């Protein structure tokens, strides 16, 4: 229980027993209690300090992995080693493919308790240039290690694609609008899918009438609600519309232009949209 000054002060004042020795002993006990509390607080704060691994990689890149451990949730040593190995290997693979990847990258790993099984128990976001947050669900069947083995590499490929392209929450290089967001998320999704072989159908599949969804988002105002149209649930029951349409856009652009995902990754969103709408509009994937 946290020390409550009001409750303890009240108990001291309520004790009216005379005697200097009794008052002296109470002072000693109070000082001792404060010392114990101070030590506990110091240890607790030390336990919550994030632990980091600085990794110097062959070539131009450097990678820092930070594990944020709390008092109740965190990573075991084996989990940290597994995550470090997977992130390191994925970083090297992505860097060989995307030459605009920042030289220095910081990955922060945290444990969450919410269900993200739809993407294999691992999710993430590109917070700022060179900075990525990766969340591991402790609720995933098999735990953090199972989630990491099945989905971490795919998540790193996805989020590092955002870093290479400049699609970050802070320092974003792109304008507003759902079509732009859909293109950038679609590029990262297809990139990760092609190079890791991992595909989460429940999260990214698109329907046969995806072309209609594309026209729908193209007609949206630039300030359309991001959650409703990208990663949340639409009032009509559809979910993750922008992510699904984004994957469709990229598949269409590849089919119509013959360009690879790496070539498309160097193009502006409006150019990719133009390629996606070119030709007969046949469905791919």
Which sequence ranges carry the predicted segments?
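C-terminal motif of bacterial Sec signal peptides marking the signal peptidase cleavage site
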Residues: 39-42
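Auxiliary, metal-adjacent structural segments of Zn-dependent hydrolase domains
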Residues: 82-131
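Short pre-active-site segment immediately N-terminal to the catalytic Zn-binding motif
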Residues: 138-155
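Post-HExxH zinc-binding segment in Zn-dependent metallohydrolases
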Residues: 176-212
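Acidic/histidine-rich, surface-exposed loop or edge segments in extracytoplasmic proteins
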Residues: 59-78
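Pan-zinc metallopeptidase signature
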Residues: 221-285
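Bacterial signal peptide processing site
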Residues: 44-46
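Active-site recognition of the HExxH zinc-binding catalytic motif
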Residues: 154-167
């Amino acid at each position: 229980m946290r020390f409550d000054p009001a409750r303890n002060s009240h108990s001291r004042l309520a004790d009216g027993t005379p005697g200097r020795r009794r008052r002296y002993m109470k002072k000693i006990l109070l000082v001792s209690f404060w010392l114990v509390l101070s030590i506990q607080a110091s240890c607790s704060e030390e336990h919550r300090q994030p632990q980091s691994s600085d990794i110097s990689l062959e070539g131009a890149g450097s990678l820092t992995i930070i594990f944020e451990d709390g008092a109740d949730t965190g990573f075991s040593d084996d989990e940290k080693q597994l995550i470090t190995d997977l992130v390191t290997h994925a970083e090297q693979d992505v860097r060989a493919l995307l030459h605009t990847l920042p030289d220095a990258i910081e990955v922060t790993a945290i444990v969450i308790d919410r269900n993200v099984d739809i993407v294999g128990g691992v999710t993430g976001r590109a917070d700022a240039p060179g900075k990525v947050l990766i969340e591991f669900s402790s609720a995933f069947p098999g735990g953090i290690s199972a989630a990491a083995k099945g989905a971490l590499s795919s998540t790193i490929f996805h989020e590092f694609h955002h870093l290479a392209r400049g699609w970050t929450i802070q320092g974003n290089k792109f304008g507003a609008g759902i079509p732009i967001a859909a293109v950038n998320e679609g590029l990262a999704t297809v990139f990760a899918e092609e190079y890791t072989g991992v595909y989460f159908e429940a999260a990214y599949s698109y329907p046969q009438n995806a072309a209609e969804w594309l026209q729908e988002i193209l007609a949206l105002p630039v300030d359309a609600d991001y959650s409703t149209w990208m990663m949340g649930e639409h009032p009509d029951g559809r979910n993750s519309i922008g992510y699904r349409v984004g994957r469709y856009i990229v598949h269409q652009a590849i089919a119509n232009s013959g360009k690879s995902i790496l070539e498309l990754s160097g193009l502006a969103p409006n150019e990719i949209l133009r390629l996606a709408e070119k030709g007969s509009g046949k469905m791919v994937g």
